[in-house]
Amino acid sequence: MTEQASSQESVEISWPLDATTIDGTVVRPSGPGSFPAVVMVAGSGPTDRDWKSPLLPGSNGSARLLAVALAQAGIASLRYDKRASGPRARENMQVLVGKLTMQSHLDELASAVGALAGQSYVREDRIFALANSEGTLHALNYQLQNSAIPLAGLVLIAPPGRPVGVVARAQLAAQAAAIPNGDALLALYDEAIARFMAGEPMAPDPALPEGVQMLLQSLETPANLPFARELWTADAAPLLAQVNVPVLVVIGKKDIQVDWRDDGEPLQRAAAGHANVTFLFPENANHVLKYESRPRTELAQPEVLPRYNAPDAYLDPDALTSILAWLAAHT
């Protein structure tokens, strides 16, 4: 199945933002429209418009698959490269070094919503955000900014229901539990993070595993500051409590990065009394909405993450059906 199927059309677009350029892909149903539409917001790091990352193998990104499914359901979509991702990353980062913030990510999303609304076949009053992981924070912040083009609703896939730093530590704690001296290594990690949050040099202990040292170094890279400190305390739950448009929260039970209980429960408490917030916990969906057949107890990051974009990976059917049904009910 390709984006060039007879029932849909795909076009590449670009637009300026400050002294940088953003690239995106619009996929639309065939015909004159007008259509409801979705802007997709990628997760953390160098994740691109397709929800692929140069840090992980494979090119079978979930956002590209979602765009095809949305078009077949009569919904247009725009997915875009964050300015620090995709083929323009090096060019854009010459301008953005030290200037990446939560606000700069919000500016990117606002510009993408404007670019999508500017397409003649899109219904400006029926634009939704479909966001993954860190992207859910930007989608929530956008809706709370009294933006010029408010969203009709939000689909939040794997939102962190705890501060991002707490979620990251929980992931590391799970890995530390499986290795000798895990508790001692976790204490060294905590000490480095405490220095980071205090604005001091992190100086991670050389005893920490290479992967953990790389994570810590990425937070302290000049290009990522002050964004990394802002992100580390960001939490979707208090933001969700303030949103007044329909929201679908999706956390797969096979997600090993965001936990459907530990993150889902704070989000459910935050949404208490909000009749327009719906929760979905698909039995077999992973962090990027792909189907995972193995039992949750057998899943570990070293094996799971490299499979996110494998050629044979596909969207979880139950999750996809529910998302499309929710969008249909709100368009």
Spans of features found by a protein language model:
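Short alpha-helix in the alpha/beta-hydrolase fold that links the catalytic acid
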Residues: 245, 256-270
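Primarily recognizes the serine-hydrolase "nucleophile elbow" in alpha/beta-hydrolase
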Residues: 115-121, 125-175
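Alpha/beta-hydrolase active-site loop
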Residues: 97-119
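Short beta-strand/loop motif that positions the catalytic acidic residue
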Residues: 243, 249-251
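Accessory cap/linker subdomain of secreted extracellular hydrolases
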Residues: 149, 155-239
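Short, surface-exposed "cap/lid" segments of acyl-processing enzymes
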Residues: 31-34, 38-69
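N-terminal cap/lid segment of alpha/beta-hydrolase-fold proteins
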Residues: 2-33
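Catalytic active-site module of serine/aspartate enzymes centered on a nucleophile-bearing elbow/loop
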Residues: 288-289, 295-331
